[in-house]
């Protein structure tokens, strides 16, 4: 079984084509693929499939390393989009892909960069959690965005301690992603991301979008540069909360699963 591993700002995914899979991707199999020592090792798996729908090049499913399926990944979407171009699924600069969160409309800017029309975010209100004021938004997946006062305060946070109780709070029945952010300038913010089913990550495209929307709702500029541990993303938030995400992604390597690993995966339910 052939696969490619891609990364975007340190957020790495295994990309597989459904037609090449000898079995269905189940939570156990996803966990085995993402295992760092006995599998490929990744932050998740992206499954691409052909669709018979005018204007659509593919459908995309996103799996977290714990085996759960996510509605969307901003970094994963860019990786999948650029993979589709490189693999010859399309030669168009603009096309659509289907996700659990709805239609994504990318524009290819270069071999390694694209802009993705992520659709409209939803303002889902504010509250207080773990001693922090938060803004809840949905950008295709749930995002709990928390503003802190300074870079020093942001750096001092232990996301390993704060992330799990926020992610699993009863107010978020499907669990939530969490972004902590601070304003560096009206058009520049710094963020740290705790992803649902993953933990703290070097970057997250949808996490960056969640922080950017929260920043915009507080009167911040758009577009805004979101500075993450893994690099920078540009997010444009319209007055109607319509989001465009721009950033890069690149292939790391391609390979074939060994017969031994394939046999082990096939034995899992």
PLM region descriptions:
Residues 118-134, 159-161:
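Active-site glycine-rich loop that binds ribose-phosphate moieties when present
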Residues 1-110, 145-269:
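A glycine-rich beta-to-alpha transition motif near the start of alpha/beta enzyme domains, typified by
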Residues 128-155:
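Internal active-site segments that recognize and position negatively charged phosphoryl groups
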Residues 120-122, 139-143, 249:
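Glycine-rich beta-alpha junction loops
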């Amino acid at each position: 079984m052939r696969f490619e591993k891609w990364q975007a700002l340190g957020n790495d995914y295994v990309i597989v084509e459904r037609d090449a899979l000898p079995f269905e991707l189940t939570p156990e199999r996803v966990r085995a693929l993402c295992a760092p020592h006995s599998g490929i090792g990744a932050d998740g798996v992206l499954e691409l499939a052909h669709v018979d729908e005018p204007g659509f090049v593919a459908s995309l499913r996103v799996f977290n390393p714990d085996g759960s399926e996510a509605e969307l990944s901003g970094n994963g979407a860019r990786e999948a989009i650029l993979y589709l171009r490189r693999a010859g699924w399309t030669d168009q600069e603009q096309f659509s892909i289907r996700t659990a969160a709805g239609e994504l409309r990318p524009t290819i800017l270069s071999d390694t960069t694209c802009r993705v029309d992520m659709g409209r975010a939803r303002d889902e209100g504010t509250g207080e959690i773990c001693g922090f004021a938060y803004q809840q938004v949905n950008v295709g997946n749930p995002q709990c965005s928390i503003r802190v006062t300074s870079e020093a305060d942001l750096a001092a946070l232990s996301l390993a301690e704060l992330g799990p109780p926020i992610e699993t709070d009863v107010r978020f029945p499907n669990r939530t992603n969490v972004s902590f952010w601070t304003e560096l300038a009206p058009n520049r913010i710094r963020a740290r991301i705790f992803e649902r089913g993953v933990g703290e990550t070097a970057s997250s495209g949808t996490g960056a979008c969640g922080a950017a929307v929260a920043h915009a709702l507080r009167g911040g500029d758009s577009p805004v540069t979101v500075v993450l541990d893994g690099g920078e993303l540009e997010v444009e938030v319209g007055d109607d909360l319509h989001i465009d995400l721009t950033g890069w992604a690149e292939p790391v390597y391609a390979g074939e699963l060994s017969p031994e690993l394939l046999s082990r995966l096939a034995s899992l339910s």
